[in-house]
């Protein structure tokens, strides 16, 4: 039975806060995130350390849904390369999640500390993450926020395993997903293009991760000023939609053709042509001996220190808010010049969310194969395109803002949290299907 569900006539039985403190010593706050506070916790009996995430119910419906979503997802998974949920408590005021504690370093820090670093080291990292992602995908779970900051070593031993953390954006794939979320630099074209999407977005993100680990550079580099976030985001999205990246010299000169081939097949703009996680595991660069053992540390480390010390890769931002902001100038012009035309051009899905949810398989197929035309639309203007221009009328409506009930855009009066420190853009995933 999904978390939080009760049988008819059954009364909710809450834990008392003392039950938690009787079992665990809770330390000081380690980090505050958008929906929760993170503590270190020690089991009083075993003295084992854990990570504790506390969600306050008073912070609103979105926080309560975020907590329930993460609990539902984590209760489903058990894999050596995923941090495991150990304990869950619900009081009248909070949710407490206790998870395994990873004491190792982030992948970047590990690379910088190595005396020798090669493609084979990268292949070992990618293989472990791919196996975890293939497992998630077998359960129809989409992580939606795979990035280097969420890949950590389990401990500080020499041959420590890699684990994936942070499942607050993960979602069960019950049909294609619509709301955009994730970290901008890792977004797949179908997310940027406001199309329906699914598990292939995780494979795209793994391609971005692999590109960075082999070169020290992000694939969609932009020369915009560090503080010019708006132009940076526009240019970034254009490049993602077009798949506009290269294996630049001299950074890729020493990298094998097999590695480049795998990156290209993971970062395929057409999600239907993109490798699945299991197909990537079977690639010769992962499962064979194609990965080079040549030392590439000097070049990679120099580029990592140059590119990833910048705040733009860690900035906290909501994807939906950012997309609305990038479209704002044209939307304001359109509203001022043709309010009547705007209403006339609205598609059935914009006028009626239920109608949008009942689109035909043909329309969904067209949406999943439209990145190239979407890229042309974005090149002609500065907006992020709307979803699924399946015909001329829908294409003319594509410049209008997405319907609020369909894409869960945060309310204007709600400020973007400033406490988030891991660069995630957030969209809330409801779990009403599971808790119903």
UniProtKB/Swiss-Prot annotation:
InterPro entries: Kinase-like_dom_sf (IPR011009), Prot_kinase_dom (IPR000719)
Subcellular location: Cytoplasmic vesicle membrane
GO biological process: signal transduction
GO-annotated molecular function: ATP binding; calcium/calmodulin-dependent protein kinase activity; calmodulin binding
Chief localisation class: membrane
Signal peptide: none
Biased composition (Low complexity): 333-409
Region (Disordered): 328-436
Disulfide bonds: none
Subunit structure: Interacts with calmodulin, in the presence of calcium.
Function: Does not appear to have detectable kinase activity.
Domain notes: The protein kinase domain is predicted to be catalytically inactive.
Protein name: CaM kinase-like vesicle-associated protein
Organism for this UniProt entry: Danio rerio
């Amino acid at each position: 039975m999904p978390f939080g569900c009760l049988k008819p006539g059954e009364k909710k039985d809450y834990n008392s806060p003392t039950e938690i403190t009787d079992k665990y010593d809770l330390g000081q706050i380690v980090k505050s995130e958008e929906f929760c506070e993170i503590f270190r916790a020690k089991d009083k009996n075993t003295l084992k350390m854990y990570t504790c995430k506390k969600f306050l119910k008073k912070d609103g419906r979105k926080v309560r849904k975020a907590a329930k979503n993460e609990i539902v997802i984590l209760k489903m998974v058990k894999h050596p390369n995923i941090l495991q949920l150990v304990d869950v408590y619900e009081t009248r005021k909070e949710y407490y999640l206790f998870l395994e504690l990873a004491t190792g370093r982030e992948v970047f820090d590990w690379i910088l500390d190595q005396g020798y670093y090669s493609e084979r080291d990268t292949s070992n990292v990618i293989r472990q993450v791919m196996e975890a992602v293939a497992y998630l995908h077998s359960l129809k779970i989409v992580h939606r926020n795979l990035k280097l900051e969420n890949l950590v070593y389990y401990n500080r031993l020499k041959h420590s395993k890699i684990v994936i953390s942070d499942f607050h954006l993960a979602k069960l794939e019950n049909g294609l997903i619509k709301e955009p979320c994730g970290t901008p630099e890792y977004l797949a074209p179908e997310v940027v293009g406001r199309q329906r999407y699914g598990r292939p977005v995780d494979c795209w993100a793994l391609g971005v991760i692999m590109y960075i680990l082999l070169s020290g550079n992000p694939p969609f580099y932009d020369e915009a000023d560090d503080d010019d976030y708006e132009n940076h985001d526009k240019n970034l999205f254009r490049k993602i939609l077009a798949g506009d990246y290269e294996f630049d010299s001299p950074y890729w000169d020493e990298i094998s053709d097999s590695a480049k081939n795998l990156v290209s097949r993971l970062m395929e703009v057409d999600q239907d042509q993109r490798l699945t996680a299991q197909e990537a595991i079977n690639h010769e660069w992962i499962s064979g001996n194609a990965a080079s053992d040549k030392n590439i540390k000097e070049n990679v480390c120099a580029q990592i220190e140059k590119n990833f010390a910048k705040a733009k890769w860690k900035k906290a931002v909501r994807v939906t808010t950012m997309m609305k902001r990038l479209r704002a100038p044209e939307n304001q012009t359109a509203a001022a010049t043709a309010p009547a035309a705007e209403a006339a051009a609205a598609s059935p899905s914009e006028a009626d969310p239920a109608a949008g949810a009942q689109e035909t398989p043909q329309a969904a197929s067209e949406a999943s194969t439209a990145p190239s035309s979407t890229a042309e639309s974005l090149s002609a203007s500065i907006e992020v395109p709307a979803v699924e221009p399946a015909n001329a009328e829908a294409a003319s409506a594509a410049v209008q803002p997405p319907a609020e009930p369909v894409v869960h855009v945060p309310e204007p009066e709600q400020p973007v949290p400033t406490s988030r420190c891991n660069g995630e853009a957030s969209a809330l995933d409801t779990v009403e299907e599971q808790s119903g």
